[in-house]
Amino acid sequence: MKKTLLTAILLGASVAASAQELTFAMQPSYPPFETTNAKGEIIGFDVDVTNAICQEIQATCKFKSETFDALIPNLKAKRFDAAISAIDITDARAKQVLFSDAYYDSSASYVALKGKATLESAKNIGVQNGTTFQQYTVAETKQYSPKSYASLQNAILDLKSGRIDIIFGDTAVLADMISKEPEIQFIGEKVTNKKYFGNGLGIAMHKSNKDLAAQLNKGLAAIKANGEYQKIYDKWITK
């Protein structure tokens, strides 16, 4: 009996010692992917997906707030283990960091105030700083004068005040915005230019962290197979 108890204690200690604690960085001002609740806790689609993956690989997840344009530089400096913040997988980013398999299929859209600007009449466009949406706007839509924002919430304020005519961003994020701002509507068609977006969103890691990438991919495949991913998707994206 004593031997059995000792074995159980040692086994438990071994599991606890080997359990990973992983820190994921994100900018929590991008609902429905990441935001904060009334208690100041980071919540959202990315958080739930990460927690589900960590449960599958028997790791403990921690989340920390970072500005979006600092995610990749700080990841390269190994200040955290991974970044999950609705990051589009692009060739340019893949040269700097290692990506997991895509966990979400992304697209981009335009929004404007109802009855105001169209894609043809708009002159000033708002985008989030450091994103592929900013890169696309600067390179591909030279008919617009771009204005960058730390968050889309700031862009909304300028849209309402008339400082910008339209906003360009992730379709799901803009849909969440419209659900809270009834005077805003989608205009034009979705954009899926694979040079900038359309390859999906991925979890970013340091280039050398191939073991972690393999673990996260294994966990992602598991939650897609067991239905947990769909539950999370329905909770945050399907409304």
From Swiss-Prot:
Among InterPro entries, the record links this protein to: Lys_Arg_Orn-bd (IPR005768), SBP_3_CS (IPR018313), Solute-binding_3/MltF_N (IPR001638)
- Species annotation: Haemophilus influenzae (strain ATCC 51907 / DSM 11121 / KW20 / Rd)
Cellular compartment(s): Periplasm
Database matches in NCBIfam families: 3A0103s03R (TIGR01096)
One BP term from GO: amino acid transport
User: Subunit notes for this chain?
Assistant: The complex is composed of two ATP-binding proteins (ArtP), two transmembrane proteins (ArtM and ArtQ) and a solute-binding protein (ArtI).
**Known function:** Part of the ABC transporter complex ArtPIQM involved in arginine transport.
- The identity of this protein, by name, is ABC transporter arginine-binding protein
Enumerate the UniProt keywords alphabetically.
Amino-acid transport, Periplasm, Signal, Transport
